[in-house]
């Protein structure tokens, strides 16, 4: 069988371990070397943390806590909190849109019995009944009315020990705080023309950007920092916030120290970062109703901007980490809409932006210290992506938003097709924002995060402004530079070749003849026959096989087998490192443990679909350890791989290891496996579908998960090349004998070839779907 190639790679991987061990032993030899530390070493001094000192800048980076400001009337900008700090009871703040919302906040001191007090609100005296039964907390009360002549009602009570209150205009709402400190939370009021609401503050106040809402909540619950509670902090007029502070030479190069050959330079720079997201949307084979993957991909962007009168050419690479995998399963029919996997970035994700420009600061970045940066935040909102179905209304993924906040900066290396560039990697934390995203014409709605379907929302780029500073050790002669800047990127060149090769491989799927594929799948392919299509000498093929084994031992399949072997306590402890995978299949107790492990799933896996999907993902490991007479998915996978290798015009010894490894992991991701027990068949798939049925009548029976898990121990696992839905469709339309049914259930290649030679459309369509799943 063609899948022999995968078992051979797994069996012989221990020889690669031995080769690597020999190399490791050779590299661990010690050698004493005398080093002259030079004038820049801190010999004899305690470790110190050098900071960059004062950094001049001309780019505005919003302060976290701006103020305090004196009481005043003004129209505060949207998306900014007004943090109010009253010193005495009475009216705190009032605001109105002059149409349907008049809102005021008053403050009552502790220990006040029910009484009526007179407050001046919006120029009129109002008698309000108030009380505060708390012994040590001040009480904020919102007074609201919807007409000019109406009466006030009390809402949104906040009991506060720090005596702080906040209000903000955002997205059609007026946001405030309610509850009791230290557990106060945000609340809101709906209003029209919210952006025109004027506020009158009767106490000192601060301004905090909405991006720092978590810090504002911390102040509300725990009080201001100690430095804000001293007599040295004096409130100033709000007009001072508009004063433009001009600083000379924001972008400068400062010589910190200098010797004959080297000098330390401090580079202070304003920076404009533009980046965009890239994605990959892959459609599954079949009738056109299913998508296999919607994922984020790294995106390069090159642009120019003016910095301090100088035109700068910059290059950024945007990538994401910690994505969340979602899926949508509309049904098992070929015309049901399905998305096998789509990625979403949320608050547990990170966005990385690698930045490089052609300025002097990036010419020499081999030895850098005291790296610091300040960046503003940016909002990223998702757009609309329509899934073009052959028939019917198109579903659309729409919405989603996240805000990016700078979380740090490190050195990195940016790769282009020909060179590697030392650059700065800016790391951004995420928080989910409104609106949520949904898939129209489905039940998927109200989910938060930014999906990969249309992350740029029609924008050419997102932009972040800020500044950075670093100290770099550079040659004293400005004409010299360290050689790393223009070093050739071998791996990046290989990635480019692999990308082109993947596209070619995927395009070749439609050119494979099914009858020849079945014949090839039955051949016992080994490493040399698999790679014989590549023009190379015998020595080159031998070296290439070693390279493939080195890469393959790090594949997901090899790792799964290794993890499984280690987890089988008694069996694993008796195996030596040189044991092959065949020793696993010969030990009956191994799969007894596996079946027990499979059934002892965590409590949250309560559905049969989840349990069977989890079991199905491990059945491949058992099937690959024991060769059966029937054909399996790995036979088809290896045959497709061999066919594409022979037909490819771009395959090389350098790209072959990556291609073979990817094929073992990614070819035919949606697989079904069955256990045959007398006249009953149990069938499960990796996407959670499960069936139990009688072989002679194809009548469905209840699926017993416990029985299925027990049968895994004693009975062989069979690849459901022709799955239950296809079998039932074949029987309903053409009628098949009991013997043919048993042979198709056993994945007998002889019967499969007969149906293909008869040009049976149902069987041909099923095999075509499997071939189309052989994608990289």
Curated annotation (Swiss-Prot):
One Pfam family matching this protein: Rota_VP4_MID
Record flagged with keyword Transcription: no
Positions of region (Spike body and stalk (antigen domain)): 248-479
Annotated site location: Cleavage: 231-232, 241-242, 247-248
Intervals of motif KID motif: 644-646
This protein's GO CC annotations: host cell endoplasmic reticulum-Golgi intermediate compartment; host cell plasma membrane; host cell rough endoplasmic reticulum; host cytoskeleton; membrane; viral outer capsid
Keywords associated with the record: Capsid protein, Coiled coil, Disulfide bond, Hemagglutinin, Host cell membrane, Host cytoplasm, Host cytoskeleton, Host endoplasmic reticulum, Host membrane, Host-virus interaction, Membrane, Outer capsid protein, Viral attachment to host cell, Viral penetration into host cytoplasm, Viral penetration via permeabilization of host membrane, Virion, Virus entry into host cell
Protein's organism: Rotavirus A (isolate RVA/Mouse/Brazil/EHP/1981/G16P[20])
Family: Belongs to the rotavirus VP4 family.
Location of the motif DGE motif: 308-310
GO biological process, one term: virion attachment to host cell
Name of the protein in question: Outer capsid protein VP4
Motif (YGL motif): 448-450
């Amino acid at each position: 069988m063609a899948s022999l190639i995968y078992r051979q790679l797994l069996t012989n991987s221990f020889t690669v371990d031995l080769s690597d061990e020999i190399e490791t032993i050779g590299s661990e030899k010690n050698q004493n070397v005398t080093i002259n530390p030079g004038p820049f070493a801190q010999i004899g001094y305690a470790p110190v943390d050098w900071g960059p000192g004062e950094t001049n800048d001309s780019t505005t980076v919003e302060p976290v806590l701006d103020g305090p400001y004196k009481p005043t009337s003004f129209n505060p900008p949207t998306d900014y909190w007004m943090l109010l700090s009253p010193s005495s009871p009475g009216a705190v703040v009032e605001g109105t849109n002059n149409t349907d919302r008049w809102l005021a906040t008053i403050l009552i001191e502790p220990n006040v019995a029910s009484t009526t007090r007179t407050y001046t609100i919006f120029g009129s005296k109002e008698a309000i009944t108030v009380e505060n039964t708390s012994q040590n907390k001040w009480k904020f009360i919102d007074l609201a009315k919807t007409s000019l002549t109406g009466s006030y009602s009390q809402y949104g009570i906040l009991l506060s020990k720090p005596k702080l209150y906040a209000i903000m205009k955002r997205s059609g709402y007026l946001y405030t705080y309610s509850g009791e400190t230290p557990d106060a939370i945000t609340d809101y009021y709906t209003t029209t023309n919210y952006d025109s609401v004027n506020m009158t503050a009767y106490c000192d106040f601060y301004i905090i950007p909405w991006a720092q809402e978590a810090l504002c909540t911390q102040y509300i619950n725990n009080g201001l920092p100690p430095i804000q509670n001293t007599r040295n902090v004096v409130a100033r007029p709000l007009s001072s916030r508009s004063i433009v502070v001009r600083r000379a030479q924001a972008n400068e190069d400062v010589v910190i120290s200098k010797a004959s050959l080297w000098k330390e330079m401090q580079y202070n720079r304003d920076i404009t970062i533009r980046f965009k997201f890239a994605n990959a949307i892959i459609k599954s084979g079949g009738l056109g109703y299913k998508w296999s993957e919607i994922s984020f991909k790294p995106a390069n962007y090159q642009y120019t901007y003016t910095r301090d009168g100088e035109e700068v050419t910059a290059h950024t690479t945007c990538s994401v980490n910690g994505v969340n995998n979602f899926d949508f399963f509309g049904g098992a029919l070929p015309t049901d809409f399905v998305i096998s996997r789509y990625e979403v970035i949320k608050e547990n994700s990170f966005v990385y932006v690698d930045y490089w420009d052609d300025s002097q600061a990036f010419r020499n970045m081999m030895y850098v210290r005291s790296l610091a940066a300040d960046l503003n935040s940016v909002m990223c909102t998702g757009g609309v992506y329509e899934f073009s179905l052959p028939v019917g209304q198109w579903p659309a993924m729409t919405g989603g938003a996240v805000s990016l906040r700078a979380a740090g900066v490190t050195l990195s290396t940016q790769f282009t097709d020909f060179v590697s560039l030392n650059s700065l990697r800016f790391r951004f934390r995420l928080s989910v924002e409104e609106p949520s995203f949904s898939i129209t014409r489905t039940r998927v709605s109200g989910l938060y995060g930014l999906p990969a379907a249309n992350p740029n929302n029609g924008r050419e780029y997102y932009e972040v402004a800020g500044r950075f500073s670093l100290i770099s050790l550079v040659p004293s002669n400005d004409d010299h530079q360290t050689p790393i800047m223009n070093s050739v990127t071998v791996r990046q060149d290989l990635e480019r070749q692999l990308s082109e090769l993947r596209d070619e491989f995927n395009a070749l799927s439609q050119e494979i003849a099914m009858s020849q594929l079945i014949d090839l799948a039955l051949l016992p392919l080994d490493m040399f026959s698999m790679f014989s299509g590549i023009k190379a000498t015998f020595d080159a093929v031998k070296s290439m096989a070693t390279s493939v084994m080195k890469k393959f031992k790090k594949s997901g399949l090899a790792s799964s087998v290794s993890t499984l072997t280690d987890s089988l306590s008694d069996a694993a402890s008796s195996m030596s490192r040189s044991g092959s995978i065949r020793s696993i299949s010969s030990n009956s107790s191994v799969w007894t443990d596996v079946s027990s492990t499979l059934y002892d799933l965590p409590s949250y896996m309560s559905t049969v679909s989840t349990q069977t999907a989890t079991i199905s993902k491990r059945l491949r490991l058992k099937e690959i350890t024991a060769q059966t007479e029937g054909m399996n998915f790995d036979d088809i996978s290896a045959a497709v791989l061999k066919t594409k290798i022979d037909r490819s015009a771009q395959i090389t010894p350098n790209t072959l290891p990556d291609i073979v490894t990817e094929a073992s992991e990614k070819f035919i991701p949606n697989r079904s496996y069955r256990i045959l027990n007398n006249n009953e068949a149990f069938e499960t798939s990796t996407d959670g579908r499960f069936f139990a049925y009688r072989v002679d009548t194809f009548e469905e029976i209840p699926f017993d998960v416990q029985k299925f898990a027990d049968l895994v121990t004693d009975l062989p696992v069979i690849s459901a090349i022709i799955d239950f839905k296809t079998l039932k469709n074949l029987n309903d339309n053409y009628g098949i004998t009991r013997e043919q049914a048993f042979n198709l259930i056993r994945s007998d290649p002889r019967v499969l070839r007969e149906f293909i030679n008869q040009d049976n459309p149902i069987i041909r369509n099923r095999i075509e779907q499997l071939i189309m799943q052989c994608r990289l």
